[in-house]
Amino acid sequence: MGEAEVKDNEVYEEDLVDYEEEVENGADGGAAAANASADVVKKGYVGIHSSGFRDFLLKPELLRAIQDCGFEHPSEVQHECIPQAILGMDVICQAKSGMGKTAVFVLSSLQQIDPVAGQVGALVLCHTRELAYQICHEFERFSKYLPEVKVAVFYGGVHIKKHKDLLKNDCPHIVVGTPGRILALAREKDLSLKNVRHFILDECDKMLDSLDMRRDVQEIFKMTPHDKQVMMFSATLSKEIRPVCKKFMQDPMEIYVDDEAKLTLHGLVQHYIKLSEAEKNRKLNDLLDALDFNQVVIFVKSVSRAAELNKLLCECNFPAISIHSGMTQEERLTRYKNFKEGHKRILVATDLVGRGIDIERVNIVINYDMPDSADSYLHRVGRAGRFGTKGLAITFVSSASDSDVLNQVQERFEVDIKELPEQIDTSTYMPS
């Protein structure tokens, strides 16, 4: 490769906006956390609708893959969305964490796509590398018996030439990626979007709330055909952001499975502990010793705190791992897989893991640092008790501002979060 080409690619890497990082006091930057694949849940979520996936008249190959994953009944959001989505309708959907939104657009896209060599037929955008990786994995799981369908994931942190070569030599039919990398590939004409028939945004409010990311999404959107299906999904979709979403759509079907004020999480026990900053480490050690858990996610507010807390836990012989932006992409994915596969039972992370990423075995979330908003709280604690299973969320409250956020959570979501009792019944948060 020539020197000029190397420089061009270096410029690309510099220009890519790493949306997943929210800089906090310079060196503290946001953290890349990684966790697990949206395992639309083995054993399946049995919702209020008893009809099976067969009622949707999906391709036999999809039904076979669904059966392999252990699903029996669609969740409420799947029951509401899939019948319309597979007909090509535009969809805007808000439903609480863990209700299988990813499977809606994955199954709908695979049902409709007619793979043509050299043409990208579906494009999925999301705001982090880890979520992109996870969504790609879901497409691979459900397209298990559709070998002619090729799926690829593109995000920053990987040399752009690898992505260009893949597009040139083995063009995928479905592309999942972050806006920065997708836009870079499309601007250089390496990625053609002229045949896209399905345009999907996952965690759409996260992308459209950010002005820079919204501009990138809009530019990508304009490169796709006018005649296409647009689907947008999120666990939190404020009334303010909904009109922005609709500007991308034509007469969309709107599905708000949960009233915004009642986004409580199915099967989740929530408590708080009042303590000083200096008492946090001792209390965390006590909790990890006393509680029964399959896997636990501990949320902190910065990369440096994630690294420090992980070091402390490892010194205390806890099986902990942390994932942050100071690592190479390869190292991050390696750790992500280790946690997902259960090799480590404790993940220390920042808010990056708080949105959209699912690991079935996680049944406890600990907010070592209070999140900065009620929305962030919802997304964080939603990592436990996924898909209607049991879970426990414990939040450390160490300041007046922490108390304010806790009050906002209780008022907005109409929940009564009580102080953690001396003894807690394991059966309330451990799946039987």
Swiss-Prot record:
GO BP annotations, alphabetical order: anther development; pollen development
Chain positions recorded as ATP binding sites: 95-102
Short sequence motif named DEAD box, residue ranges: 202-205
UniProt main location, coarse: nucleus
Enzyme class of the recorded protein, top EC level: hydrolase
Helicase ATP-binding domain ranges (all copies): 82-255
InterPro entries (alphabetical): DEAD/DEAH_box_helicase_dom, Helicase_ATP-bd, Helicase_C-like, P-loop_NTPase, RNA_helicase_DEAD_Q_motif
Gene3D superfamilies recorded: P-loop containing nucleotide triphosphate hydrolases (3.40.50.300)
GO cellular component: nucleus
Catalytic activity: ATP + H2O = ADP + phosphate + H(+)
Quaternary structure and partners: Homodimer and heterodimer with AIP1. Interacts with API5.
Domain comment quoted from the record: The Q motif is unique to and characteristic of the DEAD box family of RNA helicases and controls ATP binding and hydrolysis.
Similarity comment: Belongs to the DEAD box helicase family. DECD subfamily.
Role of this protein: ATP-binding RNA helicase involved in pre-mRNA splicing. Required for the export of mRNA out of the nucleus. Required for tapetal programmed cell death (PCD) and degeneration during anther development. Forms dimer with AIP1 and binds the promoter region of the cysteine protease CP1. Can complement the yeast RNA helicase SUB2. Plants silencing AIP1 and AIP2 are male sterile.
Protein name: DEAD-box ATP-dependent RNA helicase 15
Taxonomy of the source species: Eukaryota, Viridiplantae, Streptophyta, Embryophyta, Tracheophyta
Gene name as annotated: AIP2
